[in-house]
Amino acid sequence: MDMQSRIRRLFQASIDTKQQAMDILAPHIEQASLVMVNALLNEGKMLACGNGGSAGDAQHFSSELLNRFERERPSLPAIALTTDSSTLTSIANDYSYNEVFSKQIRALGQPGDVLLAISTSGNSANVIQAIQAAHDREMIVVALTGRDGGGMASLLLPEDVEIRVPSTVTARIQEVHLLAIHCLCDLIDSQLFGSEE
């Protein structure tokens, strides 16, 4: 297969996954946005975590809220738990890598805050511990997962929201996660500041 055919095949696979996900995920993304807006209206904040590409997604989400998405508006409180190398490495060194997010949540999380927990497999041990810590702090969890939802799905409470991408391919799951994050940012802005359409 020549390179351009391979590129087209990858584009088509991404399109197909997004089309399949659109109807399945729309109600879950809507519900997640309502949870997040309710938290923000009640002086709550967003905390976000994940590993690797999912860490990048956590940072992307937090930066879109803190700075801006597609319009000028006041900053919204959001913290990516993936960015402080001193904190991450001290926890990993002194305790365990599995606790790098949960210890931060126990310090920063408050009742009514929301945790955006991101894992393509749903089985990242440190994200699973983050969910447990969030529940201990009476936070609501929005989980971005893929495959069968993994261990994260089994931990979710009725008030939590899972956005599970219908794919087993990591790259396709990550692509839909980013789109879901952009949808969340758009819905948060439109609910808090009015629709621009």
UniProtKB/Swiss-Prot annotation:
Q: Name one GO cellular component term.
A: cytoplasm
This entry's comment on the bound cofactor is: Binds 1 zinc ion per subunit.
Any one GO MF term held by the record is: carbohydrate derivative binding
Xref: SUPFAM superfamilies: SIS domain (SSF53697)
Q: What is its main location?
A: cytoplasm
Complexes and interactors:
Homotetramer.
Classification via HAMAP family: GmhA
Q: Which family does it belong to?
A: Belongs to the SIS family. GmhA subfamily.
UniProt protein name: Phosphoheptose isomerase
Organism encoding this protein = Pseudomonas putida (strain GB-1)
Lineage summary: Bacteria, Pseudomonadati, Pseudomonadota, Gammaproteobacteria, Pseudomonadales
